Design a protein with these regions (language model features):
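Short linear interaction motif-like sites in intrinsically disordered regions of transcription factors
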Residues: 29, 70-71, 172
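Mixed-charge, Lys/Arg-rich low-complexity intrinsically disordered regions
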Residues: 2-54
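Short aromatic-glycine-(Arg/Gly/Cys) micro-motifs in beta-strand/loop hairpins
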Residues: 48-50, 63-66
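Intrinsically disordered, low-complexity, charged/polar segments
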Residues: 94-203
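Short beta-strand-centered aromatic/proline hotspots
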Residues: 64-83
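Short, solvent-exposed secondary-structure boundary/capping segments
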Residues: 84-93
Length: 203
C-alpha cells in the first residue's frame, strides 16, 4: 500500500465507511470549488498540464453523433496535449479499486516531485506545475499493458465548460469522488467495458 492509498484509507476510516467518505468528498469538492478562500481547487481555462487532475463539463463532443456514450462531467488525469487537444485518463470510467491502484502507482512514482510542488505552492492548485514526463507517449506502454488505456480520452479545449484544476494535495479526495454524468448509458455499463479491458490486460 502506497502513500496515497494510506491517506485514502485514513479518510474512509475517519468517515466510518466508504460510502460516507465518497459523499463527504463530493460535498468537499462542491464547497471548495465555489470558495474563494480555498485554493486547492481553482478555475482553469488553459491547456491541461500533464500529471494534473482537472474536472469540467463536456456537454457536446464534436463527434457526439458517432459516440455510443460519453461522460459529460469528466475527472481527468492529464497526459498533456495531442494534435492541439487535451488528452487524459478519465478517472470516472475506472472502477473504484482499480482507480486507487492507478493513482497510487503514479503518486509513488512521482512522489518526490509532487511533494516538492505541493510545499512550494502551499497547496495552491493553479501554481503547481505539471509533470513533464507524464505524457501519453511516455506512459503508453504502461497504459497498454495494464489496460488503463481504455479510459484515455481527448477533449477539445474550446468545448470545455467550468474547468477546474485540483491540487496534488487533494488527490486523496479526488479518488473518492463520483462525479460521472454518462450520456447514452449507465456508469455500470462504462465500468463493465473499461473494467473488463483492464482485467484482460492486467499482468
Amino acid at each position: 500500500m502506497g502513500k496515497l492509498s494510506k491517506e485514502i484509507s485514513a479518510l474512509v476510516t475517519e468517515s466510518r465507511g466508504l460510502d460516507i467518505a465518497k459523499k463527504e468528498s463530493i460535498e468537499w469538492y462542491k464547497k471548495t470549488a465555489s470558495s474563494s478562500g480555498d485554493s486547492s481547487v481553482e478555475n482553469y481555462n488553459g491547456p491541461f498540464k500533464p500529471g494534473k487532475i482537472y474536472i469540467f463539463r463536456y456537454e457536446n463532443p464534436k463527434t457526439k453523433d458517432t459516440l455510443e456514450w460519453w461522460d459529460r462531467n469528466p475527472v481527468v488525469l492529464s497526459l498533456g496535449q495531442h494534435d492541439g487537444k487535451d488528452l487524459g485518463i478519465n478517472l470516472n470510467l475506472i472502477p473504484y479499486a482499480r482507480k486507487i491502484q492507478l493513482l497510487d502507482k503514479i503518486y509513488d512514482q512521482y512522489e518526490s516531485r509532487i511533494d516538492t510542488m505541493v510545499k512550494r505552492g502551499r497547496g495552491d492548485a493553479s501554481s503547481e506545475q505539471g509533470i513533464p514526463s507524464f505524457t501519453y507517449e511516455r506512459v503508453k506502454p504502461f497504459l497498454e499493458k495494464t489496460g488503463f488505456g481504455a479510459a484515455v480520452r481527448t477533449y477539445i479545449i474550446g468545448l470545455r465548460k467550468n474547468s477546474r484544476v485540483v491540487s496534488y494535495s487533494k488527490w486523496n479526495r479526488v479518488a473518492l469522488i463520483d462525479l460521472n454524468d454518462i450520456k447514452g448509458a449507465t456508469i455500470n455499463k462504462a465500468y463493465s467495458k473499461i473494467g473488463k479491458y483492464i482485467k484482460k490486460h492486467k499482468k
